[in-house]
Every structure is written in structure tokens, then in C-alpha cells.
Amino acid sequence: MLKIAFATGDGTAVDQHFGWCRRFDVYEVGPEGSHLFETRLLEAASDDEQDKIESRLAAVTDCVILNIGDIGGTAAAKVVKAKIHPVKVAKGTSVEDLLTRYVRDAGRDPPPLVRKVLKAREPQPAAQSWTRSVAAELKGDAA
């Protein structure tokens, strides 16, 4: 099952800008159907652009797809970097209609951008992780 987030004011339509959204409904979606996993409520957006983006991003980090009414360039780049595929839809698009499409498509090959996100989220084999950490230490980049 994939987790898919919807920026919604009322739970029925995608109608919120990512940076100002105070509610994300997260659904689990698979070929058998979908169900509401969780409604995530956030505080009013901060005036600080970084804080605003980070708090919204933290609310959806476990999701593969993020449906929003609008999103700024900086926020979109951070969402993509977090391995989440942002989908900008027309404001007022029905959450149910989108879920119907996601369920229908769940048994098929995902679109290339979603496939890329899923591949990026796959756990790396231990040897690859180890090789990267050793290389970082040799360069002096150890975390």
C-alpha cells in the first residue's frame, strides 16, 4: 500500500496551497482499494518561509505522492528532494475522484516520475551504504 497525501481544507477536495495548508489527509492506496490512514492537522503557517515549508514537509514525509492545489518553486524542490512526487491539481478537485484513479492505477506500472520516487525510497543494500559511508570518511565528510 502506498501513502498518498491530499492538501485539503474540508476532506472532500484538494483546495490548499502547500505552504499555507493546515490539513493533510493521508490515505493508504492499493489495488484492492483505499482508506483514510490519518488526518494531519498543522498550526497556522509561520511567516518564516523555511519554517513554513519544513513543518508542512515533515507532515508528509512518509507519503509517496502529494496532491496540492498549488506549490511554490522552493517548496516543490524540497518535496522532490524528500522523495515525494508533488501533483498539482485544479483547486476543488475531488479527493474521491483522485482516489478512484489511484486505486485503478495501483495494479499497473506507475508513471515514470512515481516509479523514480519509489525506486529512490527502496532500502539500499548494506554493502552500498557501507561503501558510501567509507568513501565519505575518506573525503572527510563523515556525518
From Swiss-Prot:
Q: Which UniProt keywords apply?
A: Nitrogen fixation
What highest taxon heads this organism's lineage? Bacteria
The membrane spanning regions, by residue number, are none
Q: Which residues form a coiled coil?
A: none
Question: Could you tell me which Pfam families the record lists for this protein?
Answer: Nitro_FeMo-Co
SUPFAM superfamilies, A to Z:
Nitrogenase accessory factor-like (SSF53146)
Q: Sorted alphabetically, which InterPro entries does this protein's record hold?
A: Di-Nase_FeMo-co_biosynth, DiNase_FeMo-co_biosyn_sf, NifX, NifX-like, NifX/NifY_domain
One Gene Ontology term from the biological process aspect of the record: nitrogen fixation
Q: Does the keyword Ribosomal protein apply?
A: no
What GO terms are given for molecular function? metal cluster binding
The text of the family note is: Belongs to the NifX/NifY family.
Query: By what name is this protein known?
Result: Protein NifX
